[in-house]
Curated annotation (Swiss-Prot):
Its cofactor is [4Fe-4S] cluster. It comes from Azorhizobium caulinodans (strain ATCC 43989 / DSM 5975 / JCM 20966 / LMG 6465 / NBRC 14845 / NCIMB 13405 / ORS 571). Its EC number is 2.1.1.192. This is Dual-specificity RNA methyltransferase RlmN. It is found in: Cytoplasm. Belongs to the radical SAM superfamily. RlmN family.
Length: 406
């Protein structure tokens, strides 16, 4: 049972066992589960049924031990336990923000013996009527966006689909978000509906479209109605603009799309989002106009971080409106979230409101995203795995900046 933590920006070690040495079946798709069963001698004629049983227990019921699988024969349960586990990534640190946001630092199993395990972060953002889980797709990031903390951490590797799905399993474990489990209680958690994790956003560490195969496979697992059952309209993939993969994502997978735009001129976006040098704004916008999954009912979200004196003028707002012509879009204005060492500042609220008003009067929804989890470095642009630890001085600086931004 999950014992809810009191809201605090202080990190605490989570009471989770060390990583299993047996390969885990948690996070695998049906094909890989079938191969795992074949490897321990399950006859081919039984495999489809057994895969369906495993799928039900792992993804619908949240089983963490094969002994829980009461409709699976005792002999097979024993075989499974001898060769496999249902282990999740190790929770190294769990933090709870004053606003109820939760962040988990997760340690992944080493890919090869003797290799140093890598770490990623996942963030749960609760609201009254929903709970959004922000998942990572890479260890580190290669894009080096000027305002993003994750971009200061070098890219190590892509995550596997199983490692992406496992982030969702960890969150649901900790929140008691399975049928028959005692749900977590605490400040900010959803009070409506029967699920605590209702939406998934690929907005954590990494560029999802540079880990396309893993992300696509993970989405199919997450959306499967016999398991986790998170429909694709509740799954959003955010990209900084890997243009060749955008059409492919819409055609093959079909999730909601978000674009990390942040500038309306190539010269500025080249600085803020360096991938723009390879795929400039005109190419990016054309990919958005032809995105197969887009419609008035499934609008593309354009994320725009508000940087004081950089991209926040009325002229920028009008240029943004012009840029979005012909695209079913909404604009998400994001107050810049501070992190130690950054040279940028957040636009003041009057400037943000003027910018939002110009966009809104042009017919586009332009909500200003409420900063969540700033005090635990869980807000947009602040994620960076603790393998690259902040110094005490940097943490004090962060808290001062977060307090000043309130």
């Amino acid at each position: 049972m999950y014992a809810p933590m009191m809201p605090s920006p202080t990190a605490v070690a989570a009471p989770v066992a060390a990583l299993s040495i047996l390969p885990s079946l948690a996070g695998l798709d049906r094909e890989k589960l079938g191969l795992a069963l074949a490897a321990i001698g399950v006859p081919e004629r039984e495999r489809k049924m057994r895969v369906n049983q495993l799928w039900h227990w792992i993804y619908l019921r949240g089983a963490t031990d094969f002994a829980e699988m009461t409709n699976v024969s005792k002999t097979l349960r024993t075989q499974l336990a001898e060769h496999y586990s249902l282990a999740r990534p190790e929770i190294v640190v769990e933090q709870v923000s004053q606003d109820g946001t939760r962040k988990w630092l997760l340690r992944l199993p080493a890919e090869t013996p003797g290799e140093r395990p890598h770490e990623v972060e996942a963030v749960y953002i609760p609201e009254r009527d929903r709970g959004t889980l922000c998942v990572s797709s890479q260890v580190g990031c290669t894009l080096n966006c000027a305002f993003c903390h994750t971009g200061t951490q070098r890219l190590v590797r892509n995550l596997t689909a199983a490692e992406i799905v496992a982030q969702v399993l960890v969150a649901r474990d900790r929140l008691g978000d399975y049928p028959g489990r005692e749900r977590a209680v605490g400040p900010g958690l959803p009070t409506e509906g029967d699920r605590l994790v209702t939406n998934i956003v690929f907005m954590g560490m990494g560029e999802p479209l540079y880990a396309y195969d893993s992300v696509a496979e993970a989405i199919e697992i997450l959306a499967d109605g016999d398991g986790l059952g998170l429909g694709k309209r509740r799954i959003t993939v955010s990209t900084s603009g890997v243009v060749p993969e955008i059409e492919k994502l819409g055609r093959e997978v079909g999730p909601m799309l978000a674009i990390s735009l942040h500038a309306v001129r190539d010269d500025l976006r080249d600085v803020l989002v360096p991938i723009n040098k390879k795929y400039p704004i005109a190419e990016l916008m054309e990919a958005c106009r032809t995105y197969p999954a887009a419609s008035n009912a499934k609008r593309i979200t354009f994320e725009y971080v508000m940087l004081k004196g950089v991209n926040d003028s009325p002229a920028d707002a009008r240029a943004l409106v012009k840029l979005l012509e012909g695209v079913p879009a909404k604009i998400n204005l994001i107050p810049f979230n501070p992190w130690p060492g950054t040279k940028y500042e957040c636009s003041d609220w009057e400037t943000i409101e003027k910018f939002s008003d110009i966009v809104f009067r042009a017919g586009y929804a332009s909500p200003v995203r409420t900063p969540r989890g700033r005090d635990i470095l869980a807000a947009c642009g602040q994620l960076k795995s603790e393998t690259e630890k902040l110094s005490a001085r940097e943490r004090l600086a962060l808290r001062a900046m977060a307090a000043a931004a309130e």
